[in-house]
């Protein structure tokens, strides 16, 4: 095809190629060259969240306007970011001519963000613009890239992301901000400087152990070890063998209310303190100093914890529940033989739990536990977070609160089990391989995600499927390091499929 036979339209720098025979359609990019004021973002906020699922503590007596403002601040927080991507770089980029030029495909499927369909200014949850109408538009990311999930077409605020691919995004941004492409910003010295700074940060803070093995899994603790080590050793990276491999799924924010009772945070309870401040260390990847972490990031996260996070409650199961079957499941849940409550707590049916804070070894993959090494604890103790809490070795993973468990799939700390049906059944029946992008839909019968985005993939022989997709980042492979789907085997106590179905029905109510 000759250049004369095509015409291209640049959409967020993602070029759609149009010919007489084929049209790759694209949603128009919704932003002007200049940024918006805070007032402009506020004016569209109510319509932007009208379909967002966010449950608040009914005991929160603050006026609705105060809660709304807290939510707005959280969703547009930039933490005074040091790393920005200028909009002009997207507008002038033609790098993506060779790939699909549809905005929804790139942002939603490739990066795996949740599209913010009701927001006329921001395309996806977690993308935060600078709110300065007098400056050129630029972008950073915030907590919502990891703490928003799409289930059956609705966005769930506070849920752990099920599709975000941090490695894909980082790799794409490195290419987008390299010298070749930012050189196209002729006459935009400020934007070229922003792009150069972003490229420097992306390359300076890369370590092999912080690349997750599949999308929608976090290596935040390993990354925190790397960043704290660097600052304690004049910028030197820790050796590969000193950093653990511990891919985990992102936890839901609504578990915060339960975990406050024990003051032990994250999947292994290794951080002790009144706030889950280890999350702030991820800002170190954006080239923050320890001083900026202590004086800017930590105070903001404390404020967000008090104004938003501690007030979140789990979303209600959105489909009909068999009350009689759920009642039978409740009996089993609290029974002497099965006794889920002994580790997971007692529930009032209104989104609240008395959580015992049990952290125990039930035979699951140990890799994430081993991330918190003696070297990591020493690096933590040299950081400003040491005055906010303590990092310690843990004996096991948290018997996690089960509030909103229907939406917290896939299951176990590493997201290695796709449904409650598989989790509560024989370990030998857990699938070795399932497709991560299928997690945008709910399997209502088994409660969790479907195994395949395309049902035809289920017709492929298991050995062929493993050979074809086993190394694909869009598929979860339980044979990879740290990804084992073993442990939490309570089938000998549950015993029958009827009991399993009853337990699942009760779990929908929590």
Protein language model features and the residues they cover:
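Hydrophobic alpha-helical membrane-insertion segments, chiefly the h-region
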Residues: 17-27
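Periplasmic c-type cytochrome electron-transfer domains
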Residues: 25-510
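N-terminal Sec-pathway targeting helices
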Residues: 2-15
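Hydrophobic alpha-helical targeting segments used for export or membrane insertion
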Residues: 12-19, 402
